[in-house]
Amino acid sequence: MDKDSAIKLTNEEWESSIVPELIEYIKIPNKSPAFDPNWNKNGYMEKVVEQFAAWCRNQDIKGMRLDVIRLPERTPLIYIDIPGDIENTVLLYGHLDKQPEMSGWAKGFGPWKPVLKNNKLYGRGGADDGYAIFTSLLAIKILEAQNIPRARCVVIIEACEESGSYDLPFYIDHLKDKLGKPELVICLDSGCGNYDQLWSTTSLRGLVGGELKIEVLDGGIHSGDASGIVPSSFRLLRQILDRIEDPVSGQILVKDCYVEIPKKRIEQAKFAAGVLGNDIFNRFPLKENSKPVSEDPVELILNRSWRPALSYLGVGGLPEISDAGNVLRPFTSIKLSMRLPPTSSAKKVSKKINEILTKNPPNGAKVSFKTDWSVDGWMAPEISPWLEKALNNASENYFKKPAVLMGEGWSIPFMGMLGEKFPDAQFLITGVLGPGSNAHGPNAVSYTHLTLPTKRIV
């Protein structure tokens, strides 16, 4: 491949065509169904589908066929089939639905307000995962421009990923005859440890999430009257949470949440730690004097990829401080998110956590745990020599540095399903969610110059 020609075409297409499309995409509040139950009626998802499909149809790619598939009562899916020069099939995946707004955006910025500043495009969804469809087709155009033979390419863009991809299995079954058996799966919904080389994700954590609720009263009572007699639902909540998490160290106390970490993954974590050093935690906006749970980069990488961790996402039953009167509240609820090792069973852990949280309620309080997420993690198959060579060649060619293999801490439900359906396929899971990207949070950003490594692999 002529690297200079590839870079030239990429820069031209990215600046003149793709960035303007991403700007329009960010303006649309097409939240995933879990965050917008009226997504179909509101029409935002359809607006994005139409935008993406229109752009794709304007690309001059030989033999490309595009269909927008709409199964009954399901979010839509964009399916693109591009014939190749060899028999192999490459499956490229992305999604177009978004996380909700989130608070804390800087002045002048917002989730649906695209701001282009210093090669950074701020707004919800650009890097997670709006760029995927544009990157996929641009990569193919680069190969066509240089007459480089390639495999058949199938692109699928779903609209339910941020809700757990619960619609996707139906589409995969619907399309099974068309999909065939891909030899390589490329997913553009992952991350990178830095922006200085190519990163490939070797594993993804599983997730069990739900709402823990503790009820002590039928209604609020004057705290001066009831406190000291009626137990605080917040105190009981803390007491119950201590059953699954050490309140000092944060270590998870549920044995079912742990697995043996493969030696190969430990070796890869050590290599990645040598590349990243303290950047593994310096990339986060820690408050002054705040410290990470460890200062050993290897342990932090393994914590983030192969060990369980509990996060508290939201709370119910607590008023805003400005509205907080002297009332002993009737209940407290909290949204929990337990990240799990890639090879653990989310179903088994979910059952165990429910049992631990709800048995023997303190003071006879009413305790419930309603699970809303239960997703297995994923571990990539052993990388084939040809793919490992391609990764390193691409990274050395464009960055003068080797590729890095590392586990990620988030979940992509689609990958576990694909691993089961295509056990012989190789996987390249990569993306632009690196330092400063802040996916799912405020001030989410896409770095507008960072897509070329993925294109080179295609």
Q: In which residue ranges do the predicted regions lie?
A:
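N-terminal helical capping/dimerization or prosegment-like subdomains
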Residues: 1-104, 331, 335
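Acidic, glycine-rich active-site loops and adjacent beta-strand->loop/helix elements
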Residues: 96-98, 156-165, 188-193, 216-218, ...
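Active-site metal-coordination/substrate-binding segment of hydrolases
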Residues: 63, 87-157, 438
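Acidic/histidine-rich catalytic neighborhood of metal-dependent amide-processing enzymes
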Residues: 121, 127-203
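Acidic-enriched catalytic cores of C-N bond-cleaving enzymes acting on peptides and small amides
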Residues: 193, 202, 223-315, 344-366
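Conserved small/polar residues in nucleotide/adenosyl-binding loops
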Residues: 448-454
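A short beta-alpha structural unit
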Residues: 338-341, 368-384
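Active-site-adjacent substrate-binding region
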Residues: 242, 249, 380-425
